[in-house]
């Protein structure tokens, strides 16, 4: 709606506000998952198997540290798609796949559980970097064209 009306500045403010809100949410829940995530394991594991609980705790800590890039992926992928650019966000999915696959190959070569746990965060970083570059490229295009108004 805003894109069709040429209200690119309003879109920019929406992206900024959503990114800030999502980042606050990411920090709050990242801290909760980092420090209390092991308690959640009991909901899914019928027995208190120390080895499983320990491995899940490592995984939860790894992903909790990267909730902000995950937020960026969710906000910018959907936002760019909503601006009418359907193909660009799909390429971020390819970047995620590449990041996850590359990390898994390297981690499995070194038999690193920690590396496997970092596969999703690496994917989120790859995709968020690509999506941010796309977003700023799109916005610069509208600024240069003089379409950056309320």
Question: How would you name each of these model-derived features?
Answer:
Residues 1-65, 107-150:
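Short alpha-helical transmembrane segments in multi-pass integral membrane proteins
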Residues 8-11, 83-97, 101-103:
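Cytoplasmic juxtamembrane regions at transmembrane-helix boundaries
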Residues 23-24, 70-72, 82, 98-99, ...:
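Short hydrophobic/aromatic segments of transmembrane alpha-helices and their interfaces
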Residues 26-34, 71, 75, 101:
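Hydrophobic positions within alpha-helical transmembrane segments of bacterial inner-membrane proteins
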Residues 67-93:
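Membrane-interface junctions at transmembrane-helix termini in multi-pass inner-membrane proteins
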Residues 75-79, 101-106, 132:
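Alpha-helical transmembrane segments of multipass membrane proteins
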């Amino acid at each position: 709606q805003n894109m069709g009306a040429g209200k690119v500045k309003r879109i920019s403010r929406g992206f900024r506000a959503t990114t800030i809100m999502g980042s606050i949410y990411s920090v709050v829940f990242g801290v909760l998952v980092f420090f209390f995530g092991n308690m959640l394991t009991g909901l899914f594991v019928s027995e208190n198997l120390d080895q499983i609980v320990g491995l899940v705790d490592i995984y939860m800590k790894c992903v909790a540290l990267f909730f902000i890039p995950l937020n960026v992926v969710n906000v910018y992928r959907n936002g760019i798609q909503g601006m009418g650019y359907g193909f660009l966000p799909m390429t971020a999915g390819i970047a995620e796949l590449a990041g996850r696959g590359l990390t898994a190959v390297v981690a499995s070569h070194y038999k690193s559980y920690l590396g496997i746990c970092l596969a999703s965060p690496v994917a989120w970083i790859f995709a968020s970097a690509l999506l941010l570059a796309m977003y700023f490229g799109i916005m610069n295009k509208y600024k240069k064209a003089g379409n950056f108004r309320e």
